[in-house]
Amino acid sequence: MAERSVPALRRTAVGRLAVQIRWRYGAVAGLLATLAMSVAIALTDLETLRVAVAGLYGSEGNLLVGWIAHLLHGALFGVLFAAVLTDAALEDLTDSPAKCAGTGAVYGLVLAVVGAGIVMPIWLAVVGFGAPPSLPHVTIPLLAWHLVYGVVLGGVFAHLTNSPPRA
């Protein structure tokens, strides 16, 4: 096994730390984006959180469970967003808040169609939800909510990753 030089080890450690920090930024951006999305949901269809999202965990009708689950999902999908953008080929998508918000918008729409439109109805059927939505379940409000999520996710993530470190 070849020994690695101290500078090479240092670069590896710094690279790993940068990835860990970006993933944390992804979680924070995902959480803030989910809060923004949740406001949009609350203004248009609060029952989505109370019934459908809570129903994923067998707690249909429990707004607190729906709210917590939604926040956790949003943070986890924020980490996934950060993980994807950690790839060197995609890293330039975080150069500016506008470019990253656009990337986030596309990401949010993909989550709407795949996650909420396909996976969620299947998951609800598996856990015995009373009346799971038809497949695929893609509505204008669903797309709009996830667009809010994606734009906020991308904008916040770009801001966090491009801000100078604090002393």
Segments and roles (model prediction):
Residues M1, L72-L80, W145-F157:
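Hydrophobic cores of alpha-helical transmembrane segments in multi-pass inner/ER membrane proteins
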Residues M1-L31, D92-A98, A105, V156-A167:
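Haloarchaeal acidic low-complexity proteome signature biased toward cell-envelope/secretome components but also
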Residues A33-E47:
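Alpha-helical transmembrane segments of multi-pass membrane proteins
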Residues D45-G61:
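Membrane-interface interhelical connector segments
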Residues Y57-A75:
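Interfacial helix-start motif at the membrane-water boundary
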Residues G78-D95:
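Membrane-helix interface/capping segments
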Residues G102-V126:
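Hydrophobic alpha-helical transmembrane segments of integral membrane proteins
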Residues P133-Y149:
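Individual transmembrane alpha-helices with interfacial aromatic-anchor signatures
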